[in-house]
Amino acid sequence: MGSEPADVSQMCRDLLSTAVSEMGGQERPGQVAMAKAVDQAMRDKLHLLVQAGTGTGKSLGYLAPALVYCVEKGAQVIVATATLALQAQLAYKDIPTILDASEKVLSRRPRVAVLKGRNNHICLHKAVSYTHLTLPTICSV
């Protein structure tokens, strides 16, 4: 494994600590260990598989090192989710929190975009094909 200056790991730790504090929570040892492992894997360009239980703080555990990496390297990071529920949690709760913490700790607020696949958008062709239906028919439960 490669080595990075201690201040980089400290920035990641400070960012995580600030974000967790802003959410009214406390760091968990597993969350800190995960953030450190993600940080190291990104720097060494390695794959990493993490398994952790519900409530471990996985989202902030990977977002903190990802943001430090983005700011430090000027790189982009892609976070893909398996569910729309997790995507919404990230987009509306975890990412805004980590970005607020980033302004305080890193003096930067990286740009973030939420991208969705075509299955999450209306198909204009299909929408037009349903125009013969009345609104109550389309909206009936």
Predicted regions and their residues:
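Conserved structured core elements
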Residues: 28-32, 54-60, 80, 88-92, ...
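Proline-centered helix-kink/hinge sites
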Residues: 65, 135-136
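Walker A/P-loop NTP-binding motif
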Residues: 60-73, 96
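Walker A/P-loop
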Residues: 44-62
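Conserved pre-motif I regulatory segment
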Residues: 5-49
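Generic, well-ordered alpha-helical scaffold segments in large soluble proteins
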Residues: 37, 41, 66-69, 101
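Short, surface-exposed connector motifs at secondary-structure boundaries
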Residues: 44-48, 73-78
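A substrate-engagement module of RecA-like helicase motors
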Residues: 2-20, 74-133, 140
